[in-house]
Regions:
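Iron-sulfur cluster-binding electron-transfer modules in prokaryotic oxidoreductases
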Residues: 2-253
Length: 253
């Protein structure tokens, strides 16, 4: 109902609809333009410190109406083939370290990475947010989610496949939430075509790391098997990795 109401307030031909259509047609460029903004904010945080940065940006927010900055604002991020190779190298390094330390559990978790020729395959579509935004400056986590996901998949013996022209792709949630349902469906169709090709017509499972995105994908894409991380790990990786129970709260989104 909310989407229908918003659709009525943003009819075709309106300025808001034209803006949404422009973003959809130039999505890769829009995402690329966001990364320097995040990098600039991170640079300002590094130079000014948290307290000064908070004071200055709060004043700018009150006067100019710019989005409110917080210390949790992420750095910029981009998925590249280099990061995919880096994840492989990290897994290989961990395997070598585990061998020297005779840590059999960690070795089991990583030993299958080297079997590239016989590896299972998975199509990984990181959400638009995770393609563009990394970690906050003072995050206790060492790696962005995409890097962690790639590393985990490779430790489980999976070859990771990204869909072609991934920077241009989106499930359409952004436009659906604004009532631009036709644009949302168009973006979903583009994504489906790219995933269909990458998965070799549904031969390989498709993984998306953001539950709202996966929810819409499941509503619009019927001919492929789609998974979120916890579900994929439970279905495909639980017998291939060694898990160590942690004594702390864990949030599953």
């Amino acid at each position: 109902l909310t989407h229908i109401i918003r659709q009525e307030t943003l009819p075709k031909g309106s300025l808001g609809y034209k803006a949404g259509d422009f973003v959809a047609n130039h999505f890769a460029g829009v995402k690329s333009s966001l990364r320097p903004v995040l990098s600039l904010a991170n640079f300002g945080h590094s130079v000014l410190g948290t307290k000064a940065m908070s004071s200055i940006t709060k004043g700018m927010h009150n006067v100019l109406g710019i989005p409110l900055w917080t210390p949790a604002m992420p750095k910029s991020y981009k998925v590249t083939s280099y990061k995919l190779q880096a994840a492989t190298d990290m897994s290989d390094k961990l395997q070598a370290t585990s061998t020297m330390q005779n840590d059999s559990a960690a070795l089991v978790a990583c030993s299958s990475v080297a079997r590239n020729s016989t590896a299972d395959k998975v199509v990984y579509f990181p959400s638009c947010i995770n393609q563009t935004m990394g970690l906050p400056k003072k995050s206790p986590v060492e790696q962005p989610l995409v890097n962690k996901m790639i590393s985990l998949l490779q430790k489980g013996g999976y070859e990771v496949i990204f869909p072609k022209d991934m920077d241009k792709l989106c499930c359409g949630t952004i436009w659906e939430s604004k009532g631009m349902l036709d644009i949302a469906d168009r973006k979903a169709a583009e994504l489906e075509a790219a995933l269909w090709e990458a998965s070799e017509q549904g031969k390989y499972p498709v993984l998306c790391d953001q539950s709202p995105c996966l929810h819409r994908m499941r509503e619009t894409i019927q001919k492929m098997k789609l998974y979120e991380p916890a579900e994929f790990i439970y279905t495909f990786l639980r017998d291939k990795l060694v898990f160590t129970q942690t004594d702390r709260p864990v949030a599953v989104h």
